[in-house]
A protein has these predicted regions:
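Short, compositionally biased "basic patch" segments
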Residues: 120-135, 222-228, 299-325
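A general structural motif
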Residues: 114, 146-152, 243-253, 271-274, ...
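Generic long, charged, amphipathic alpha-helical segments
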Residues: 316-349
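Hard-cation-handling environments
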Residues: 158-302, 316, 361, 367-369, ...
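Conserved phosphate-binding/catalytic loops in two-lobed NTP-binding clefts
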Residues: 380-391
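Amphipathic alpha-helical heptad-repeat segments
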Residues: 21-22, 27, 360, 373-377, ...
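Short, conserved loop/helix-junction motifs that constitute active-site signature segments
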Residues: 2-3, 126-130, 198, 284-289, ...
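His/Asp/Glu-rich metal-coordinating catalytic cores
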Residues: 1-181, 187-198, 202
Length: 418
């Protein structure tokens, strides 16, 4: 839209998911702009354009080039890229840039989000052996995940207990990756008849984006699945379908769910509860002590999801103060991010050659420098660069310092969260 003329290089399945997500986001941008313009016209404000439109999103794909894992892609003279499975989401990748100039050869690895081990469906992160420099994430750099003996058994216990009391299980979930994992586990729960109180309990997927993304997960996944998932596919098992699974289409159907008193499982986006249909379901279920809200993913600072996990007693939704009486469960083991120990194991495996410098990014402002210290204890040189910092790789020094952006206080449930 602003004149970018180059290529957008990504894995095949990331491109498939990106198209769905960009179109969904563009639709929201257009709807929000239309709403603001209706209000603004009455108030005499200037016309607002959407950040991008659905046509803009479609135009992106004129520039997209797809590749597969381990395929070397020449970007220009002396620069090539190799994508390695990061085990985070379907199609996710760490990227190794190979640079050569005047006979000098260097490699820079960008970790991207590194995945958790033993996730269903996708493979574990593929380890890398060499790099001169590494730019590495630190989402969970200060903690380890709670060990879970069986995701299926634990989730079944939560569902059984809640539905047995006549309540609903409401699961805020990311539409891509996490929702499909939940469907995988619930299929196992139903196959094994683990929910005794309501064996044929209804499950509602209330996210058009999740529905569209699931079609990608049901497509050609050659080269992306783990061994267990491959066996299921060979046996003809549909990994994400089971009896009494209901896909909610319209917003009217979504609202009707809250009029239905049948105990049920509702999976809806967004995963951090800051937007989407999940907010309606929270409004109708948070105040009920018989209901359970299950968080199955990372909750960022300042989000409604983080506030609920931290024990806020009430929240404001759609102009109403809603008391929090439902049981709040943090299903920590179910994470698509590597925890502290697995992040350290990932970087420790890069040793031929050992990186000259490791840059720690993509973590809360307290977490990134803490994790950098952990990496240094392994014998690496590491630091967490600040925003806009410029680092000279040849001279191995900071040439322009960065800064920490000011934290903005955010109102959540009538309270200021900073």
């Amino acid at each position: 839209k602003n004149g970018f003329p180059g290529r957008i290089l990504t894995t095949r399945l990331t491109a498939d998911l990106m198209k769905i997500m960009l179109l969904d986001s563009a639709h929201i941008q257009e709807s929000d702009a239309e709403y603001e313009n209706r209000k603004g016209e009455r108030a005499g404000r200037e016309h607002v354009d959407p950040l991008y439109t659905e046509q803009d999103a479609l135009d992106v794909f004129k520039y997209v080039t797809t590749c597969e894992y381990k395929e070397k892609v020449d970007l220009c003279e002396g620069v090539s890229a190799v994508f390695t499975d990061a085990g985070h989401l379907l199609g996710s990748a760490s990227i190794t840039l190979e640079l050569e100039e005047n006979g000098v050869h260097k490699t820079i690895v960008f970790s991207g989000d590194i995945g958790n081990v033993d996730q269903p469906i996708i493979r574990d992160p593929q380890l890398l052996k060499k790099a001169d420099y590494v730019v590495m994430e630190s989402t969970y750099g200060d903690r380890n995940h709670t060990e879970v003996w069986s995701y299926t058994d634990e989730l079944a216990e939560i569902i059984d207990e809640t539905l047995g009391k006549g309540g609903n299980v409401v699961i805020p979930s990311f539409a891509v990756g996490r929702t499909q994992e939940l469907l995988y586990f619930i299929r196992e729960i139903k196959d094994q008849k683990l929910v005794k109180s309501t064996p044929n309990f209804p499950v509602y997927i209330d996210s058009p984006l999740a529905k569209a993304a699931t079609t990608v997960f049901c497509g050609d996944l050659h080269g992306y699945l783990d061994e267990q998932a491959l066996e299921l596919v060979k046996d003809g098992t549909h990994m994400f379908t089971f009896p009494n699974l209901n896909l909610v289409e319209s917003s009217e159907e979504s609202k009707m769910l809250n009029m239905d008193t049948t105990p049920k499982v509702i999976i809806s986006a967004s995963g951090m509860c800051d937007a989407g249909r999940i907010r309606h379901h929270l409004k109708h279920n948070l105040w009920k002590p018989e209901c359970t809200i299950v968080f199955v993913g990372y909750q960022g600072e300042g989000t409604l999801g983080r506030s609920l996990l931290e024990g806020v007693r009430s929240v404001k939704l759609f102009g109403e103060e809603i008391a929090v009486h439902a049981k709040i469960v943090n299903f920590q083991g179910l994470s698509s991010h590597a925890d502290r120990d697995h992040l350290l194991a990932w970087i420790a495996d890069i040793k031929a050659p050992k990186p000259q410098h490791v840059f720690i990014v993509h973590g809360d402002r307290e977490v990134a420098p803490y994790f950098a210290e952990s990496v240094e204890k392994l014998g690496f040189t590491a630091h967490a660069p600040q925003y806009t910092e410029v680092y000279d790789l040849i001279d191995d020094k900071i040439v322009a310092p960065g800064y920490l952006p000011e934290r903005k206080a955010k109102a959540v449930g009538g309270q200021r969260v900073s």
